[in-house]
Amino acid sequence: MTDNNKYRDVEIRAPRGNKLTAKSWLTEAPLRMLMNNLDPQVAENPKELVVYGGIGRAARNWACYDKIVETLTRLEDDETLLVQSGKPVGVFKTHSNAPRVLIANSNLVPHWANWEHFNELDAKGLAMYGQMTAGSWIYIGSQGIVQGTYETFVEAGRQHYGGSLKGKWVLTAGLGGMGGAQPLAATLAGACSLNIECQQSRIDFRLETRYVDEQAKDLDDALARIAKYTAEGKAISIALHGNAAEVLPELVKRGVRPDMVTDQTSAHDPLNGYLPVGWTWEQYRDRAQTEPAAVVKAAKQSMAVHVQAMLDFQKQGIPTFDYGNNIRQMAKEEGVANAFDFPGFVPAYIRPLFCRGVGPFRWAALSGEAEDIYKTDAKVKELIPDDAHLHRWLDMARERISFQGLPARICWVGLGLRAKLGLAFNEMVRSGELSAPIVIGRDHLDSGSVSSPNRETESMRDGSDAVSDWPLLNALLNTASGATWVSLHHGGGVGMGFSQHSGMVIVCDGTDEAAARIARVLTNDPGTGVMRHADAGYDIAVDCAKEQGLDLPMITG
């Protein structure tokens, strides 16, 4: 049966305050975060349930959304809701320390794990692409990836430019839910940036939310602005309406030399996320319905041109890296044999953090009050007094990042500190310092929760890039530890067949029971990241495991 229930002309907004609409905060929290994912301030295309990342949805269709909401409002604290690719399929008796929701999205048996088969199922209403935090109900807008992008740019500055990006500029493309973080991250890291985007509506959204500073009228204007701002040492972000597969080759032809090149277009999904050269967006969307194979071919041909230009920049000695959208794979399939000559961002800049379980720890204020986030910011500084880099991030985040939907914060911390912060937040709820409970979650892009050979697990030391036992173990352990909701997805970030990953969210409601769950979950979750990297032979991870007292029988036993 074809699914015709993916569009509804409605605006969704999560309830605010401390009055429950469900039976407890353990069910109110997933309800509010589901709704928050579809807030028009948060989602890319909420009327079609699309949160970010091409077609990353929060629910399979509107009938499923309605039934999820209805079920969460009646769910008891000894029951668990099962969600299968965005559809609520069952409620079962469990116990009070079990997750209230268990989610599996987009998972396919490996032989069938490709876009063609998935799209057939999607068209029949039998599947949903959950991306990473879209279908797991913990997306917080572009802030969710700002710090990770910032950390990447800062580390690139350390490695290539002596620790400073002042007077430098980044060339990139894509201003969607993930890519939209790039201009602000570059600015916070001290660099100018030129951000190419083919949809004017996305540029408008990033201008409105202050993620990008200016829009140039054409390429010449953009380059003039870049030249002016870099000469003045100013970190200003510039958007340019255009197609990266046209603009990058033109820049190569002109001999323009950026200081860093990357990309965050939705190249992972050629049918829905990458505009072929010479096409309008309307043509692209229409032909995706009538000629999907031709659309995919045209998109991948344009990606090949795009990647070739990136390779041309790299040949000039310009730091060039993939930012996790699988564009190198798409280009390789289209004949660019050396597409992987430039690295992904994780092996190039982020893996040492993952070895210590450091990753995108995030929290949201269910109250809707910004002041609750500012109080937690202060608590983080109090509990981690000597980390000047982290303090600078929090100060910049408060000054520059506009909240989208429920106020939230992201803060990269690792094993040991996550549990410490979570317990402190729970105590703040208990004492009344915070006006309502907090939810703590993370991106699936974390140290122990994803297997993705072209992104997070690219070039693992022991060659275990494609082993996907690790996110399964992470999901199982978070379930056993008492996370409030746990998710297990396929295909996020890099597309069907290229990743498996898991997520968790835990509620801080101020109770003793919550404190026990928080201590378990926020220790065990990052602990799996240290375990995974120690098992792969990374000395940093082995040392961290020993320092933190992890029991790893083959390593610390």
UniProtKB/Swiss-Prot annotation:
Kindly state which reaction or reactions the protein catalyses.
4-imidazolone-5-propanoate = trans-urocanate + H2O
Residue segments, region Disordered? 445-464
Needed cofactors, names only, are: NAD(+)
Q: Which GO terms describe its biological process?
A: L-histidine catabolic process to glutamate and formamide; L-histidine catabolic process to glutamate and formate
The secretion signal range is none
Q: Does the keyword Ribonucleoprotein apply?
A: no
The pathway to which it is assigned is:
Amino-acid degradation; L-histidine degradation into L-glutamate; N-formimidoyl-L-glutamate from L-histidine: step 2/3
Alphabetical UniProt keywords:
Cytoplasm, Histidine metabolism, Lyase, NAD
Catalytic residues? 411
Gene Ontology molecular-function annotations: urocanate hydratase activity
Q: What Enzyme Commission number(s) apply to this enzyme?
A: 4.2.1.49
The subcellular localization recorded is: Cytoplasm
- A GO term from the CC aspect: cytoplasm
In this chain, composition skew of type Basic and acidic residues spans: 455-464
**Chief localization:** cytoplasm
Superkingdom, natural source:
Bacteria
Q: Name one Pfam family in it.
A: Urocanase
Please tell me where NAD(+) binds in this chain: 53-54, 131, 177-179, 197, 202, 243-244, 264-268, 274-275, 323, 493
What InterPro entries does this protein map onto? Answer: Urocanase (IPR055351), Urocanase-like (IPR023637), Urocanase_C (IPR035401), Urocanase_central_sf (IPR038364), Urocanase_CS (IPR023636), Urocanase_N (IPR035400), Urocanase_Rossmann-like (IPR035085), Urocanase_sf (IPR036190)
Cofactor stoichiometry and binding?
Binds 1 NAD(+) per subunit.
Functional summary from the UniProt entry: Catalyzes the conversion of urocanate to 4-imidazolone-5-propionate.
In which family does this protein belong, per the annotation? Belongs to the urocanase family.
Mind telling me which PANTHER family this protein's record contains? UROCANATE HYDRATASE (PTHR12216:SF4)
Name the chain's protein.
Answer: Urocanate hydratase
